[in-house]
């Protein structure tokens, strides 16, 4: 049985917080997969996929990008990353979650956008 661990960590944008989860398999970790959701999505949408993969030995992690899911502070934040260089903030936040998640083994990034 896999275990979900919810986490928060500071965004690379000052004053902002990222919310995410890690789904840890029972037993040996065969691989690590970091999920990156698409625009106007949220990471909790992928919990069933994470559980499916974790039940097969894959540690899965992911977070809500700024302006998405539980990382939204106000309705004005909806779909908004940051100014200036919001795209760089998203990449830096992805990297921060990667560093937080690194363990021995294989790691892959699964990105999705419709």
Where do the model's predicted regions map?
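Gly/Ala-rich beta-loop-alpha elbow adjacent to hydrolase catalytic centers
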Residues: 111-114
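Active-site glycine-rich loops that stabilize anionic/oxyanionic intermediates
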Residues: 35-41
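N-terminal cap/lid segment of alpha/beta-hydrolase-fold proteins
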Residues: 1-27
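Alpha/beta-hydrolase fold active-site loops
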Residues: 30-34
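Secondary-structure boundary motif
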Residues: 26, 55, 103-107
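Conserved alpha/beta-hydrolase
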Residues: 50-76
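Alpha/beta-hydrolase active-site loop
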Residues: 82-109
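Divalent metal-coordination and catalytic microenvironments
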Residues: 46
């Amino acid at each position: 049985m896999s275990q979900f661990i919810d986490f928060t960590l500071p965004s690379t944008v000052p004053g902002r917080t990222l919310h995410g989860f890690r789904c840890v398999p029972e037993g040996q970790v065969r691989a690590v997969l970091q999920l990156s959701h698409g625009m106007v999505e949220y990471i909790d949408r992928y919990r069933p996929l994470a559980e499916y993969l974790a039940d097969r030995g894959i540690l899965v992690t992911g977070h809500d990008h700024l302006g998405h899911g539980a990382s939204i502070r106000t309705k004005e934040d909806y779909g908004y990353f940051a100014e200036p260089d919001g795209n760089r903030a998203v990449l830096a936040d992805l990297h921060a979650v990667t560093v937080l998640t690194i363990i021995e083994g294989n790691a892959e990034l699964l990105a999705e956008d419709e």
